[in-house]
Amino acid sequence: MSATTTTENAKTSHITLPVPAAKHALKLDGSDPSYGDWRDDLVRDGYAIIKGAVPRERADSYADAMYSWLEGFRKASAKTRTDKDKLPWIDQKGMCLQYAVTHEDFAWAIRSEPGVVEAFEKVYDDKDLIVSFDAINFGFPNRKDLPENKPWPHQDQDPLKPGFRCLQGLVNMLPNGPDDGGLIVCRGGHMLSEEFHREFINEERIPAWTPEWFGFTDAGMKWLEEKGCQWEKVCAEPGDLLVWDSRTPHYNLSSKTQQPRFCVYTCFMPVADASQDDLVRKRDAFERWVGTTHWPNARHTGSNVGKRDGEDDPHNRFEPVNKPSLDERAFKLTGIPYIKA
């Protein structure tokens, strides 16, 4: 198998692998057995922390690579003065998806870390997985050049498609304490998802660009509170993997301290759950160095065109600064080897 991208472009060649039958994934519906590890937390609470999924030394090196990427962008904008212009476009939630950043070598190295991949293999009981080309989070505290990061509680799953369908994740790269911003989840909310959406079926929905996103209104938040659900800020150390059921209500907070927040969003699913059209679309995203949402089947693909004040960023990039070199295991995560010739 040719399982390594070239240094000039992302055109790929491969030997087609058979798409295996679906395995026995966790159900997260109260019927799962006890596992004696973090999976019990996931089943009960709708989220879990896998401590040290990435060894600390490597996590620190990835954080350094992320800083270097930002500093390289800053050098390209050396004649400007404001923070906004010295950085790539990063929204108030800390997310960056343009500039081909989602395919930088550090992003792929993090996605293909054994401890990260193995965690998702345990959930899906499957080694034939594909991974999302999702956003990178560069959350800097006290930025005055961005809008306020207001709470945006949501679930990343279409209410009309119930049940456990997707496990979201992020790999944390810097110390992340209770006041350092980051992921906040509604503990146990995943188990109430179907009941909630039955009761709120006629509520006017918050506008969204995809049906796979549902925002919770004040009435919805009150309902969750009355059901005894509590919101918990998830704290983590460098190298920890955070995972959550996409039905679990969640959002992210901005830091109240001087501590930045760096993380890489990582979501895996069995390749058996993706169609051949999905895989072809995913290959196109990989070859164009563009990102996807958290859905690994590339339901939606993005763009590398960052905008500033409505205009294309003059420092847009359309390929990674440091292109990834993927071994056979990582290349399978692109989904390309499973495309039928």
Model-derived regions: residue spans:
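Non-heme Fe(II)/2-oxoglutarate
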Residues: 14, 20-23, 201, 238-243, ...
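Short edge-strand/loop segments of extracellular domains
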Residues: 140-141, 186-194, 267-273
